[in-house]
Amino acid sequence: MKAKTDDGIRLLVAVAGHYEKIVPAGTRGVVLECYNNPEGYIVDISIPDPNELSGYRYDCIEVAPEQFEINQERLNELVHS
């Protein structure tokens, strides 16, 4: 498997989010669940959005291994915190 639970990721392509919203390439997130057959991942993501009170729009999406890369910055944060 490409990733494991709690790995940080960065999307390589835009993917469909919920409510007809598009999650842009470059969006970062965290793996919540991993599936083996077929390989897939549930990822919690946050997208900057000035229209939201928090400044972010949150979504939980399904991604395939070819749609993301491991975010080394997130891994370093976890190791050094």
Where are these regions (language model features)?
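Basic/aromatic-rich interaction segments and small domains that mediate binding to polyanionic partners
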Residues: K2-S81
